[in-house]
Amino acid sequence: MSSKNFSWRYSLAATVLLLSPFDLLASLGMDMYLPAVPFMPNALGTTASTIQLTLTTYLVMIGAGQLLFGPLSDRLGRRPVLLGGGLAYVVASMGLALTSSAEVFLGLRILQACGASACLVSTFATVRDIYAGREESNVIYGILGSMLAMVPAVGPLLGALVDMWLGWRAIFAFLGLGMIAASAAAWRFWPETRVQRVAGLQWSQLLLPVKCLNFWLYTLCYAAGMGSFFVFFSIAPGLMMGRQGVSQLGFSLLFATVAIAMVFTARFMGRVIPKWGSPSVLRMGMGCLIAGAVLLAITEIWALQSVLGFIAPMWLVGIGVATAVSVAPNGALRGFDHVAGTVTAVYFCLGGVLLGSIGTLIISLLPRNTAWPVVVYCLTLATVVLGLSCVSRVKGSRGQGEHDVVALQSAESTSNPNR
């Protein structure tokens, strides 16, 4: 172990055990209470649109918070940002379990998302600090990624069981207690891993990726994929439990099948992307989104009200989601190695804002108890991405390939930001 990492003396297994609860709890904050969503408007005396906003704000703040907590963890250290984020998450979760005010509930969801974002940033920054340039980094990222991929499958099922036994408020108490345990372990065993103070964020760096067509292509690819899943889990409780009469437990199990399709696809993509190339895989993912949307539209037009008529096309959409999310990060970061941290934050922030705002707008304009929001979102975003892919392909057709040329152009522009 190198001297710069002398403070971290844990095995790989112990490291995963210490880090993973923060990532899991941050993700469970989005998925675990989905089975209770149809009943929450009555409990809080509000509208379904307000409850939808609690989903949107959490997702958007998770991404936007990285612009704040990433540089903050570089300046103050990983440990204080992690523990501060854990404290915010605990306070918000316990408040969510107690409040009966829709306005307070929404504010606490924003606080909970900020805490989750701080924990995510600190966790992945710690992995970079400890294992930078070492083979273990790929192992631990793979383990954490696999755990996070399973949350959409396990989270709603766990939430349904807690709701059935103790009520929906206990879901947030469960999250708060889990974060208390994780933070207590971190307070005792998690040393500071940042050994060198990093200069503050140069805000001009935030503009570097937005000038690059390749960055926008893959950021929109991410927004198309994750946004499709966001719209799905936003409308699925009302559609399946309300319109189709599925029980909470049945909903959670059916929801899990889509998440499982995504997990298996993501694992398969690790072999497909190097063989076929990012541009081809991107187009394949968008094609799956469009095909799934067309099948959903057919079931709606022909009034096929069966559960299978909704969930089977969603398996295809789920494959498209996993494909898009697998290919997007590396594609967006190509050409920005020297400012990868900043560009990563911009990527997740813009992606979260785009999918949250566009998805929420579509949900608000279309009937929530139908598949039309998923259909319109998938068709719109996937078509935009495919169109932008064609533009990028034309621009990069002079020899080296579409994205290599664009990446070189972006690298040249970033080397002289004052140009």
Curated annotation (Swiss-Prot):
Belongs to the major facilitator superfamily. Bcr/CmlA family. Its main location: membrane. This is Chloramphenicol resistance protein. One of its GO terms (biological process) is response to antibiotic. It is found in: Cell inner membrane. CDD domains: MFS_MdfA_MDR_like. The keyword Cell inner membrane applies. SUPFAM superfamilies: MFS general substrate transporter. It comes from the Bacteria. Residues 31-46, 102-109, 163-169, 236-245, 300-306, 364-370 are cytoplasmic. GO terms for cellular component: plasma membrane. Keywords: Antibiotic resistance, Cell inner membrane, Cell membrane, Membrane, Plasmid, Transmembrane, Transmembrane helix, Transport, Transposable element. Gene3D superfamilies: Multidrug resistance protein D (1.20.1720.10). Appears to provoke a reduction of the content of the major porins OmpA and OmpC. Residues 1-9, 68-80, 128-141, 188-214, 267-279, 328-342, 392-419 are extracellular. It comes from Pseudomonas aeruginosa. InterPro entries: Efflux_drug-R_Bcr/CmlA, MFS, MFS_dom, MFS_trans_sf. The gene is cmlA. It is a multi-pass membrane protein.
